Amino acid sequence: MHILMTGATGLIGRELGKALVARGDTLTCLVRDTDAARRRMPFPATCIAWDHTRPVPAEAMREVDAVVNLAGEPVADTRWSESKKALILDSRVQGTRRLVEAVLEHGPRVGAFVHGSATGFHGDRGSERLDASSTKGTGFLADVVAAWEAQLQPLATRRPDVRVPVVRTGIVLARQGGALAEMLPMFQLSVAGRLGDGRQWMSWIHLDDIVGLFVHALDTAPFGILEGVAPRPVTNREFTAALCRSLGVIQNLPAPPLVIRALFGERAAIVLGSTRIEPAATRASGYSFRFDTLESALDDLLAPLRGGVRQRIWEQWLPHPAEAIWPFFGDANNLEEITPPNLNFRVLRTSTPVVGAGTRFDYTLRLNGVPFGWQTLIASWDPPRRFVDTQAKGPYALWHHAHDFVPFAGGTLMRDTVRYRLPAGWVGALAGGCKVDSEVTRIFDYRARKIDERFGGQSCP
């Protein structure tokens, strides 16, 4: 199947794209910046530059069988100024309208248009039990979602042959990205608690399930609403307790609503509002959830993060077999090429003439302007599929870096999984955790750019 996708660089889009390519689908992705998208999408795709205020290029619709619409300005990243609210609305309404127009004008083969919507449609409803048949709520987000979904109506009128399932997504739980990732640093330090009185309902879903639901919608679901939430919503009080149990930490004092509103402004409605949704339509459509309890979802996501460990994963698809890529990464001297210059990274010595399990590297670098000596131990070496390096001596209490080279879609999915913990326990994490997280992200973003320059990436005209 040839699928046109928007929002492919987002939390859901990256995982959905991998799932679709893995089963043999071909993707064309509409993106704002083709170079940035190439580095962020862990799957092969043809990328076409597009701005939601302009018509979709006709060539993007060529031989397209289905559309998946995940695009929209983030709602939870900054305070809602009037300009931000306008962008939240316009990116969704105009963008969806343009996509629908493209299907009507240039997409005769399109048989499905899967629309990613949001549970914000329901507004703040207290403990009322809601599902796909429930009425619209009140508030800014409810108005946005209603206007957003209304743009789909021309498809029902002029192309009744096109299936248009609408997935109203709730709070997506993922180890990296989304609401949970924002909560984790403070909870790991045991300085966070419930929000307000904790009675507000949270309709959540595991990332794997929301990806599975979009695939299900693409393949089988008819026109209509699907609730993108797990079968068992919880209150914020229950969520907080389960999160602390899974991490093995204690709860702290609750955050007063007045403080939350002062910090977040109108955006506080996202965390203080209550939405209790049951996925009746989703279950009736035949979808089977992998994670139907919060405990099972959190245990799956958080097991690697206990004991104050932080984890980041970077994935990059390269159009070469692992055998062609491995020699570059197996040579420690090439590390200088893919490390930011300001770190002054220098390899001093290698303990063995040929790299393998047990090899040690000594090098120097600067972190936040401070010089450090570092010794790395190659803990495992399995060419050309995997190697693991760990810090033997250095500034971290723990540093574990797994390099995986996975055959995928005619090339290689390169995955870097980094687990680290700062020294001095919670004091070190509180004092420098955010800065270190930012520095680690910057280092690996630079690494992705340099790897893309050397090995090439997507087909992005």
Model-derived features: positions:
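N-terminal Rossmann NAD(P)H-binding glycine-rich loop of SDR-like oxidoreductase domains
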Residues: 3-23
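Conserved Rossmann-fold NAD(P)-dependent oxidoreductase catalytic core, especially the SDR/UDP-sugar
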Residues: 85-90, 96-139
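NAD(P)-dependent short-chain dehydrogenase/reductase
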Residues: 146, 153-158, 163-166, 170-201, ...
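Alpha-helical substrate-binding/gating segment
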Residues: 184-192, 200-234
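Hydrophobic ligand-binding cavity/cleft-lining segments
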Residues: 218, 277, 303-352, 356
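Mid/C-terminal beta-alpha module of Rossmann-like enzyme folds, strongest
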Residues: 219-266, 299-300
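Beta-strand/loop substructures that line and gate deep hydrophobic ligand-binding cavities in soluble
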Residues: 388-442
